Amino acid sequence: MKSNKTVKIIIFTALFLSAVILISVMTGAVKETTADTDSVKLPVIMYHSLLKDEKLQNDYTVSPTLFENDLKYLAENGYTTVVVKDLTDYVYGKKSLPEKCIMLTFDDGYYNNYYYALPLLEKYNCKAVISPIASVSEKFTETKDISVTYGHITFDDMKEMSDSGYVEIQNHSYDMHSLKSRKGVLPKAGESDEAYKSILTEDVVKAQGLLENATGKKPTCFVYPFGAKNDLTEKLIKEMGFSCTLTCTEKPNIITKNPDSLYELGRYRRDRNESMQNLLIRTEMQS
């Protein structure tokens, strides 16, 4: 009896120690996924429109299936999606960032972002940044013209998306999204700095008011239309209080505790002919 009791004690002790070791390993694994260092790599992916019809897909339009496969790949490979607030919280010491973090962005605010992307973000517990052209959303809010093909999100759509916790709304200008008289928010040829400052400020502030009124949250990031900017543009955007800017330049980003690391972030356009795996390999090769 005594020997049996001893055996039981040995077995119990072994099981207990195994459990302790397992918990320690699991806890360590969780800790390893959080970056407590002074810098974090951040690839930013740029999407625009999501449509099922292959005939309508192009350099800026991919299928909802491709987007879902992207989310699956990211989840299966340990990536965590972040938004601008996560970055600013990290910079100012309010939180850590995941070691393998990535930002997904949608430009222009197409209605199909609401129709296709939002349910998929909810399904895979992912977040994204959507930057609508405020004047276009204003128009579709007034006309109530709903179309997955050509429509844009309304202010009510923005509110719902923002409240979901899966989408962050940022500023993409009110109506400076053209290649005609000027390229995006760039100055016109021969335009004085004073005139340019007045026009840019009026446009961006108007967009800020509409977006904040719609969501109850003030945008903190300016997303350059076409990625077009110059030194004066960046200076004026900073003076308006934006803590982050996004470009269309394909380059890797290193986020540090320095607030300046959030300006002029590079983004990689999501090409439908490239796998997410290859895209991320490209970002690593450029790091």
Where is each model-derived feature located?
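N-terminal pre-catalytic segment of deacetylase/amide-hydrolase enzymes
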Residues: 8-16, 20-102, 263, 267-271, ...
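Extracellular/periplasmic catalytic domains that process cell-envelope and extracellular macromolecules
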Residues: 36-40, 95-98, 122-125, 161-164, ...
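Substrate-binding cleft of extracellular glycoside hydrolase catalytic domains
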Residues: 86, 105-110, 123-126
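Active-site environment of divalent metal-dependent phosphoester hydrolases
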Residues: 111-113, 176-178, 226-232, 252-255
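A cross-kingdom marker for long, charged
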Residues: 229-232, 236, 244, 249-281
